[in-house]
């Protein structure tokens, strides 16, 4: 299930403008990530002891596999470590799972950003 957002379409070749018009957890071009990429990014999360469906993001926040793309207690998104607006790519090395609140809080901040939600 996809989050519903109203986004103003920006027709520009400027990378920063394109990045700002993207929905959270989308590719550099604003497309949804394919299932294989979602699974590969999920595999990068830190295991949660005793639970196979829950893991932890880079901030230590608990995320749930089935809550991908949801704004729930354990919802998560795919984050571009180096933001698209700063030259980040869709390469797996530049992607990480983040609790949706941490991803929104991080925004375009890089390299200095802080976690909003922890354990």
Which stretches of residues belong to each language-model region?
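Short, intrinsically disordered low-complexity segments
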Residues: 1, 21, 55, 64, ...
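Short, compositionally biased leader-like segments
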Residues: 20-31
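Catalytic cores of phosphodiester-bond-cleaving enzymes
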Residues: 13-21, 40, 46, 103-119
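Histidine-centered nuclease catalytic patch
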Residues: 61-98, 106-111, 117
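Mixed-charge, low-complexity interaction segments
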Residues: 2-17, 22, 42-47, 51, ...
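Short cysteine-rich loop/turn motifs with clustered Cys
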Residues: 31-76, 99
């Amino acid at each position: 299930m996809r989050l519903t957002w109203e986004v103003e379409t920006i027709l520009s070749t400027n990378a920063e403008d394109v990045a700002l018009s993207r929905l959270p957890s989308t590719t550099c071009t604003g497309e949804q990530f394919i299932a294989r990429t979602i699974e590969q990014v999920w595999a990068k999360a830190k295991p949660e002891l005793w639970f196979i469906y829950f893991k932890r993001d880079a901030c230590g926040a608990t995320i749930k596999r089935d809550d991908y793309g949801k704004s729930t207690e354990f919802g998560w998104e795919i984050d571009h470590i180096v933001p698209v607006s700063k030259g980040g790519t869709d390469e797996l090395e530049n992607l990480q799972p983040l609790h949706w609140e941490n991803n929104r809080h991080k925004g375009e901040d890089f390299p200095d950003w802080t976690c909003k939600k922890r354990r």
